[in-house]
Amino acid sequence: MTEVMKQKCRFSHPLRRTFFEEDVPVDMTFKEMQDHLIEEGFIEEKKGGYQFIFEDHMCKLAAPLSDYVPEGVECMEIRIHGLLIVLT
């Protein structure tokens, strides 16, 4: 049986000053994390979805968490950005 690698993550809510902390499987994509956080009731489902920001870098929704885990970090601080961005 293969053990699933996990990384502790602390998500900050886009509007409220609240946090959600959990050990996340490193093969989970940010889209899957978004769906999970909606299921947990931490964020609300909304048109346009959310962006996840780690160390001032916007994470790709299709990318797994493992693409962004720095070596030796105990807990990743991930901001959730919920504002609609319009490109002109």
Where in this protein do the model-derived segments appear?
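Ubiquitin system architectures
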Residues: 1-88
